[in-house]
């Protein structure tokens, strides 16, 4: 009996790699409508999305989009991450800002948390030329981080045009500071493509480009963001189709 079990196990182990090399099944067209697929994704991610402090905000965004109540303990973690000097919290802030803009259309933030959200947006360090010293390493210079910081600064400035931020600049000044840098970034992406091409950073670049396209008040920025987003998706399709 033990030899039979060994034989079965050996055959199974040999079969697994062979099976893994078989072509994947796929369809040339979706099996359901866009709204059905969107609802399925939001339902799944609302319950199973990342709980990591940097990325937990995306689960909360999915919950808001699907009509579920926010997890307040997780939202407090989101605010804490943004108020910290932690590297990559520009990912977190860009998603939170998207939620803030969507909340203006259909309210889902509880009243008791809105003050803390505003405080962390006004206090954020939006670029390395802010006089406040970083207490930990923060990456500003790579392709995705450049635009994440500038997008967050533009959208934050739009929200609080006349309000003084912690660094002494008001919202309009932040908008001007961000626009100058964003226009150059968008021009370079459209002319030369992405230096972080076909990388996992595309997902955060989709986020920032969608934020600009959906919420930027400047029509030129909005138009250019749409064109660069089209270019990014074209890159993805070329890779998928093995052209």
What is each stretch, according to the model?
Residues 5-15:
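Bacterial N-terminal signal peptides
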Residues 15, 33-34, 67-72:
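A composition/secondary-structure signal for short, hydrophobic, low-basic-content segments
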Residues 18-20:
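Boundary at the C-terminal end of the N-terminal hydrophobic targeting segment
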Residues 23-28, 35, 40-42, 59-62:
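Extended, charge-biased low-complexity segments
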Residues 42-216:
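Aromatic-lined, polymer-binding surfaces characteristic
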Residues 220-236:
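Short secondary-structure subsegments characteristic of cysteine-rich extracellular domains
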Residues 241-243:
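Conserved small/polar residues in nucleotide/adenosyl-binding loops
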